[in-house]
Amino acid sequence: MEGKVIIFSAPSGAGKSTIVNHLLGLHPEFEFSISATSRPPRGTEKDGVEYYFIDADRFRRLIAEDAFVEHEEVYEDRFYGTLKSEVERIWAKGNVIIFDVDVKGGVNLKKYFGSSAMSVLIVPPSIEELERRLVNRGTDSPEAIAERVAKAGSELEFAKGRFDFELVNDDLQKAFEEIEAKVDGFLCA
């Protein structure tokens, strides 16, 4: 292990990207770990910026080559993972790695990095609020939203007791203040 990592996990739509982007704006020494995915880009997403977009066949080859710290088939033929080369790239610059991953990915990353990592589970105030956020995001079909909402309950159940800290994202300003204090404590430890 070389440096520290902060892992953010949540069901889709819980607000983890908003919180991660807030922290990245406050801390120039933080760097976002770009995940790899086999899903197609949404909207204006660009390869190498939001994600490394890799087709499912190539993703499977990289898994076979042990190129990932962690990976997960989140939906059929929809893979997400953290490339070892991405971790090496960020640590080579002396930066703190920020992960924005699904719940299973967060648990796997915490196991991999151990005490070098702080893992944070971001929780929506309710499943109904999560569904409202996904609808308002406007990037997914009604079928995809229903699938994500159904998955959220099982993800939250799986996550119980597996994260260092749970942040309820109800009031965004309060969530920012709470996570800033936790991050400062972790970095000073």
Where are these regions (language model features)?
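Walker A/P-loop
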Residues: 17
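Post-Walker A helix-loop "phosphate-sensing" segment adjacent to the P-loop in P-loop NTPases
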Residues: 25-33
